[in-house]
Amino acid sequence: MKPINFIFTFVISFSSLVAQDYFPTNKGVKTLNSKQILITGAVVHINPLKQLEKGMILIENGKITDVSSSIDIPRNAVVYNFEGKYIYPSFIELHSNFGVPAIKGSSSGRRSIQYHANRKGFYWNDHILADYNSHEDFKYDPKKAKELRASGFGVVNSHRKEGIHRGTSLLVTLNDVQNNGYRMLEDRAAQHLSFKKSNTSGQYYPGSIMGAMALIRQVYHDAKWYANGGAKNKDMALEAVIKNQSLPSIFETSNKLDVARAAKIGNEFGKKYIIKANGNEYEQLNTLKKLKPQLLIPVNFPAAYDVDDPFLAQKLSLNQMRYWNQAPTNPKEIANAGIKFAFTSSDLKNVKDFLPNIRKAVQYGLSPERALAALTTIPAQLINQKGKIGELKKGALANLIITNGPLFEKETEIEQNWVQGQQHIIKPKPKKSIDGEYALNMKDTSYKLVLSKSEFKIDAKITQDSTKLKTTAKYINGWLTLRFSDSTNTKFAQLKTKINNADNLKGDGSFFDGTYVNWNADKVEQTKKEDNKKKKKVLQKVLPITYPNNGFGFKTLPTSENILFTNVTVWTNEEEGILENASVWVVNGKIKAVGKIDDTEGAKIIDGTGKHLTSGIIDEHSHIAASSINEGGQNSSAEVTIEDVINPDDINLYRNLSGGVTTLQILHGSANPIGGRSAIIKPKWGASDDEMLYPNADPYIKFALGENVKQSNWQSYGRFPQTRMGVEQIFTDYFQRAKEYKAAWRKYNNSSKKIKAKIKAPRYDIEMETLVEILDGKRFISCHSYVQSEINMLMKVADRFGVRVNTFTHILEGYKVADKMKDHGVGGSTFSDWWAYKFEVNDAIPYNGAIMHSQGVTVAFNSDDSEMSRRLNQEAAKAVKYGGVSEEDAWKFVTLNPAKLLHIDDEVGSIKVGKSADLVLWSDHPMSIYSVVEKTMIDGAFYYDLDRANAQVDQIAKEKNKLIQDMLQAKNGGAPTQKPKQKKSVEFHCETLD
């Protein structure tokens, strides 16, 4: 039996095949009509690594029953011959909201912030919606399904994009013929998470990314506790978390830093998240290699910027311009890094761009095999459907696309998409082409006829001499009909012909006057021009990334060197004081020798004649380099940590280096009495967030007093405390609860195994764990403070609970209570000369630092500001001006003293043998307003060099100019463009709510 070559395709309905056998029928005799389909002749790509040149696929009941080079044709089979075609598995989309309605946010404004959950019988936070199941609201969308099929998709995993814990998704095929019972492969396919709050509730917490991270962690702890019977009440959200824990977990992120953050949480709790990424992961591959995430990669490659206007072009950062150039390499770079990934279309404005952008990724180096895997087998594995979808094998769903060429070639088109054995025509079979220019003659009159697009929807143009005549055309079933007007547009002629020879058209019709007419049209030979040949598009040269991938980044990260500073004035901050014409030798990141040095074993020499060498500046109070600063959704946020949200790409880190800063503490803001945990970092420009963290540093936490925590200047008054008296009660209450929490765990841990088997473990509370660390002297307090009464209050509360406040920061009335601070053992990290910028600092004076210093308090000057942090050397000089502090002691205000407050003075803060080589070379006296930083060294490596910085200014200008020229060329070549938009940067301060 020969295969049948179908010219006209038809739809095969499987309703009789798949209808449940226990359903009654009242429309006739109940029969089983099991049709089989045999596809032959095509190149069949069984999976990304295996193909058959003349493959055959046998389909029955929506599934593949055989794939081979030779199959005996069943008697009742319908045979399709696709000779010359290519067949691939249909694609799988894992991150969609197909058919699931979105929730619109409330349009009514709230005067007061909502602090508590609305849902009863669920988790204490409304943004944990683990109990929601997307299949309950699913409604199949034929229009959207058609769009997705046209781009190659056969299966989508769909969920409602709402909340931090979003509940479950459903896995559904794009089969228009059947009902949801047949389409739905899994009603609970995966659970979904994000860092975004839901529109279903106005509950404020979490108000920051670090709050969202803490909440996710606490949910996991609570689910474990709940599963062990710890709760007295029923919590349907936690029950859903427990029920769904075996499902794949898909985590949506908004930027590259969030990808790593999500991966860290997953690794912490043994969850192998599938993380929906953002397209610029190539910028942090070293981090991702360590975390080993599974990724869903978008392909929304940016359009070139329209840089015709040079003033608008100035708004663009180098990173924005590089992203246009480098983004198409993202899939290749991720593949080369050995990271498992699948593609997603979810970030595209138009799904039609999906396959062209995949092809672009292949052009930029991604292998076709890896690209196909990311569309088929890998998403199938990730969603626990290996062998069922994503490949053409026995037992798998008959989901396949048929193309007219190799999938990743630019001109190849998807002609059909079969879903569960159901044929969907994407591109109808083309009609015989009659495109071309013809010389049309009738009644001794000549016309020019041009036909185009005849394979699909024909377009016709007729001109007489130079006059265009209004023309319409139809080309159906081999018959061509032309209708056109005369030059006056008042009379019409109508011609028709049956196409036999496309080079010579002959027919009859009616002339303008209504008389019968014969006509003919001979095709005009076109002269082929040499320059009309298609030229292969030359890809833009991809620029190398830097670390970080923006202005002033490094091509390779700095490493420690063997360096000898000679003939330099050395500010030791030790008993030796200031050494003239001295040397400092640095080896392996440490200071090896100070003073007169003879043998340096091949060190690189830096002549410091006329210059000054100091230890690096330490900023005890900073808010730079973080993605969020305040978690103000509760009156205590001890559960959050700045370490979660460090932003290593913040340009302020580089600017700090240019000001000689080598260590800084990024503090939580002052939105609540008990704030979050801080991060102590070294600004190693180009390193990852984890690599910047100060190793083995003591942990700190931010407390706050005054106007901010009682919301004096807020428009909402719904949160306790609202008075300074209430602030005192917050500290007392939380410390007491921490004591009781500690006692409960001690009692449980000290119990015998026999007793433990009969009782329930206490609930693990991240917030309480942090406060217990304070009670145990393992975590230290840095407290935002202004007014002496509150300063006294906190010291008294701390004494009552056996706690010592480590640092009062700001402390602008410290001069009033310096003696009490000395007795308590607390340091003061203050401003040099800030006063009268709000009511509670009306009594501030510029002599504050000097007075506290004279009373024996360890005093530091901090910045609390991204601008001031670059000139803390000048702030130190103000201690000499206001109060007559010696130059050496004043310099310690920004070096050794903050090191003492941070408990790292054994490693940094002075120039001493054995300490870390965190050094700054100044052009002049370090406290002079004329002095500039020439070099900044951290752990023996130069992270800032003035000469290099000056050279980079020119390099950046040249690179931006090249990218502008490339974008102009792309625009002239017809590429889409976008309007230049300046990338907004947020400057965080104590009161910034994010």
Give the ranges of each region predicted by the language model.
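Tryptophan-anchored aromatic micro-motifs
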Residues: I39-A42, K429-V450, E455-D465, T471-A473, ...
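Beta-sheet ligand-binding and adhesion/scaffold domains
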Residues: H95, N441-K443, Y447-K448, W479-N549
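Polyanionic/metal-chelating signatures
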Residues: Y140-N280, E413, V419, I434, ...
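His/Asp/Glu-enriched, well-ordered alpha-helical/loop segment
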Residues: G28, G41, I103, R111-Y123, ...
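Histidine-rich, glycine-flanked metal-binding segment
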Residues: D21-K35, V44, P48-S90, G105, ...
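C-terminal cap of metal-dependent C-N hydrolases
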Residues: A42, L397-P430, V568, S916-I956
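Bacterial Sec-dependent N-terminal signal peptides
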Residues: M1-Y22
